[in-house]
Every structure is written in structure tokens, then in C-alpha cells.
Amino acid sequence: MANLDMEQHSSENEEIKKKKHKKRARDEAKKLKQPAMEEEPDHEDGDAKENNALIDEEPKKKKKKKNKKRGDTDDGEDEAVAEEEPKKKKKKNKKLQQRGDTNDEEDEVIAEEEEPKKKKKKQRKDTEAKSEEEEVEDKEEEKKLEETSIMTNKTFESLSLSDNTYKSIKEMGFARMTQIQAKAIPPLMMGEDVLGAARTGSGKTLAFLIPAVELLYRVKFTPRNGTGVLVICPTRELAIQSYGVAKELLKYHSQTVGKVIGGEKRKTEAEILAKGVNLLVATPGRLLDHLENTNGFIFKNLKFLVMDEADRILEQNFEEDLKKILNLLPKTRQTSLFSATQSAKVEDLARVSLTSPVYIDVDEGRKEVTNEGLEQGYCVVPSAMRLLFLLTFLKRFQGKKKIMVFFSTCKSTKFHAELFRYIKFDCLEIRGGIDQNKRTPTFLQFIKAETGILLCTNVAARGLDFPHVDWIVQYDPPDNPTDYIHRVGRTARGEGAKGKALLVLTPQELKFIQYLKAAKIPVEEHEFEEKKLLDVKPFVENLISENYALKESAKEAYKTYISGYDSHSMKDVFNVHQLNLTEVATSFGFSDPPKVALKIDRGGYRSKREPVNKFKRGRGGGRPGGKSKFERY
């Protein structure tokens, strides 16, 4: 009982002590509060809060100290006090900093508090600087992209075109100009001569036809004035294509348009010329014929001459014709030369036919000379397996893809087309030696086709625009990298277009890849797997041996293949004396080489070839000792 009374008395004493402590604390608070208000009225709120915080904590500290002595402190209370400490310390340090009486320890605390703010501010500045840098980089990237892309942001509407021309362009589906169009059309419309170079599929045709149509419109050309614009193309198909574009552009104009090309009826063409053709598209040979022999052909008023694919026009069999044509045409005229590549011979022609020309090369400085969307590869196939390789490849994609296959000679193209038809491979062919009334429908048919196989020679390698071609297969390699570029240019045409190209080489021809890479043409090797080839060799050999017409066709193809091989200008790559004739014969369906008269150069390997003299016809391309029809690359 005594103990209980003592404990009760002790607890009462504790309560009394607590009350005394609280009262003392309140009195001290009043004393501290009053002078602060008098001396520093500007900091009234801050000091009051700070002092109140300190006062409120004082009894807790004393209570905590007392409880600690008794050994019954509350852990939760300790945690609460510990959490409140930094907050109060922050407020105190901020206040002391304002008064300027912080000590070193407090300075460190303030520095620690200010550090995150400084970091945030720095991060914000860095972000702003980065944004500006990114914006500059984006603009540079856009400029770079525009320089390397086919398209520009310039519209046809920005040109000072007649309403009728602009209406036609709009109906054709064009809004923005390509690089060559944006750079060539303005000087041409101002009457300047232009030497233009742009990759295939870049819109060269519109680049010269739009100024041509505008010229005829401005000078009010009529049929009785004759021909005011003349466009010369190297091939019939390219002439037909250019004629089609010109016809669309002149749809709402009163001026007339026509074409004269080899293979058509000359008499019919002469009658049309006599009626007056204001814009004439022509191939060199037939044009020269009409210039010299058609009396009703009026060309004395010619204002504008265009030579499209000028480097091809200058090849053998065209040089002399072109020289005569230029001598017959009026000297006072505007002239332009356009091509996918600029050779020394084109520059020579420009010097004698152009006056102070504007030189435009939209591909200058590009890392690659072929189209961006083009995937290019090559496959090394032994000569004896070439035919089986081609059959296997075409069988895989027949009816699924649109494919062009290039051969070195007309006879080789003809034989393969006949063979494929015998074995139920549907295919078309474009080459020399086919009547124009058959060749033109074939050309138009392949344009409209979604899938199909076209076998062709280099006659289809320049300027022709076949939509959506998936594969270019160069079964026979080209003469040089320039021809390679033109061939693969039949696919991946236009902005964003995709396509694939495959070059078939024998092991002896592998050095050609070095020349391609030196010409900035990226090619990847594809693995040749013999086990995947169709096992049809006995069938093909039996078919050819039993079919007289097919056998004769194969003989001619074999013969011209070897003659064509001998005419290659790059003798260090394509040396006819390194051919294994037994393997070559196998690739044409023979078990043994056929007996044919081969006229090839017996002089052996020659590492160098002299270039063809400008404006002089060289000796026959495939004849013994004759120079190549192509200038050495």
C-alpha cells in the first residue's frame, strides 16, 4: 500500500512539474516574440513560425529526455521528431541566410539545398540548347535529303506556265518537281542551252517537254509553220514513250505532235509531216531520211532541238547520222542534251552544238549512282549451268513478279524466247529484227502488265519507263558500268520505289565487280546453290536436238554470243580466249559444241583499247579486229 501511495505521489509530482515546464516555455516564448516584432518587422511571419516551431519542440525534447531516464520512450514519437528535424532545420537555415548570420555548417546545408535547383536550371538550359541544335540538325538533314532525293518541294504551280499546260500536268498526276525538272525548266524557258545529267527515272522527259510546249504556245506556232520543236531519241520505244508524254501535255493546246521512227511506213509519215507537225519526236535514221528526201517537211522554223539519251545517240551507227542532221538543221536555235551519264563524247558534242550552255548534274556528289530503292546483287555461276540457273530463277517467280532479262545479242534473245515458249514459260521479247507492228504492241503490253517476263537486249536499257518492275536480271553482263547503270535503271524508278537487280557472272568474269565498286555501284554476292537447280538438262538437250528450227536458232545464238563476247571493250574481264566452248555450248542446250564459223580476233589478249575517235565511225563492233561499239570505260 505504501508503495502504491508513493507511486501515486510520484506521478502527481510529475504532473506538477510538467505544468510548470509548459508555463515557463510559454513565458519564454512571449519574451522572445516581442523583441523580434519590434526590431525586425519585415520578418515577422518567418520569425514567429520559426520561434513557434522551436518552442513547440522544446517540451517534447524535455519530455523525451525525462522519459529516456525512466526508460519508457515511445519509438513512434522518436521517428516523428526525427522526420520533423530536417524540415525545421531547412526553415531555420533559410531565415538565417536572409539575415546573413549563417555559420559554416549552415552554409553547407544551404549549398546542398540549392544544388538540385542549380542542376534543374542547368538541365533546362541544356535541353533548350539541345533543342536548338536538334532543330539545326533537322534542317540540315532535310536539306541533305532534298539534295539526294529525286523529288523537291517546288511545285509546278510555282512556274509561270500557261493554264492549258498546267491543267495537263495536273491531270497527269504531278504536283511537285523532281531535281532535274526544278533545275532545268527555268533556264530552258528563258531560252538558254542546257546540258543535263540525271539518273534514269528522274523525270528528264518532262524537264525538256514542258519548256518545249510552252515555247510553241508563246510563239503561237501553227501547222503551216512546220516543225518548231524536234526531239531525237536513240530507240523506237523511247521515241514512242516521249511522243505519248508530249501528246498528253499538248492535250489542251492547238499545236500538233507526231513521231517518225524506223519500222513504220515511211509514206504515211511523209504525209503527216506535209500537213505540219509542230512537235516532232524521231529516231536518228528515219529523221535523216525525211530531212533529205521528204519535200513537204518544213523544218526551217525550228526553234528548239532536244537530244535525249545523248550518249546512246553517239554510239556507233548513230554518230554519222547525227552529224548530218546537225548540218541540215537551222543554226539559230535553242539546243539541249540530256542523259543519265555524261561521257567525253557527250561533252564533245555539247561543245559543237550548244552555245554557252547551263550545265546541270543533279547526281554530282552522290555516294551511289543507282537509285536508292534498288537492291543489287550478283551470282557467280559456271558457264555450263547458266541456262539451268535462269530457268530455275524464272520458274520461281513466274506469275508472281515483273521481270526483265537482258541478253547480249538479238539472236540469243530470240532463241531463249523460243525455248521458253516450248516449255510453257510465257514471255515477251523486245530486240532488233522484230517488225515494228509487233514490237510496239509488246512494249505497250509489258507496260500494262502487273507480272510477266520480258527478254530483251540493250534496246530496252535506256529511258524506257516500265512501271513496277520487280527484278532486273543481267543474264549476259553489260559491256561496262555505264551500261549496267542504264539496265538496272528500269526498276526502282521514282521517289520511294523499290526493286532488285541480279547480275550473272562466270568465275572468269568476277573482276567486273571491282569496276562496279569503283564506279560507286554497291553490289552484294548471292550464294549459288547447285543442288537447287531444276534437273532439266537432259530434257532441254533432247528438245533442241529433235527440233530443227530450235536447233538452228540455238546455233545462231551460240555463234553471236561468242562474237559479241569478242566485241567487249574490257578485255581484262571479258577475254574470248578464256571461254570454255564446251561449257558455253551446254548453256545453249548442246551436249557438244556445234560446228559454226566463228570469226573472232586471233590476236590474243589485249589489255588496252584505243577509244573511238569523236565523230568518226569505228570498224564493226563484232567484226574481226573491229573496235567496240562502246568507248572503253
Swiss-Prot record:
- Tell me the enzyme class: hydrolase
**Coiled-coil blocks:** 2-34, 117-153
Task: Enumerate the catalysed reactions.
Answer: ATP + H2O = ADP + phosphate + H(+)
Annotated signal sequence is none
Q: What is its EC number?
A: 3.6.4.13
Q: Where is the composition biased (Basic and acidic residues)?
A: 1-17
Q: Name one GO biological process term.
A: stem cell fate specification
Q: Where is this region: Disordered?
A: 1-147, 608-633
Location of the Helicase ATP-binding domain: 185-360
CDD domains listed in its UniProt record: DEADc_DDX18, SF2_C_DEAD
Q: Does the keyword Ligase apply?
A: no
| Record-annotated disulphide pairs | none
Keyword check for Lyase, yes or no: no
Keywords for this protein: ATP-binding, Coiled coil, Helicase, Hydrolase, Nucleotide-binding, RNA-binding
Q: What is known of its domains?
A: The Q motif is unique to and characteristic of the DEAD box family of RNA helicases and controls ATP binding and hydrolysis.
According to the UniProt entry, which residue ranges have a biased composition of type Acidic residues? 37-47, 74-83, 103-114, 131-140
Annotated residues that bind ATP are located at: A198, R199, T200, G201, S202, G203, K204, T205
Q: One GO CC annotation, please? A: nucleus
| Official protein name in the record | DEAD-box ATP-dependent RNA helicase 27
Motif, Q motif: chain positions: 154-182
Q: Which SUPFAM superfamilies match?
A: P-loop containing nucleoside triphosphate hydrolases
**Where does the Helicase C-terminal domain start and stop, copy by copy?**
386-534
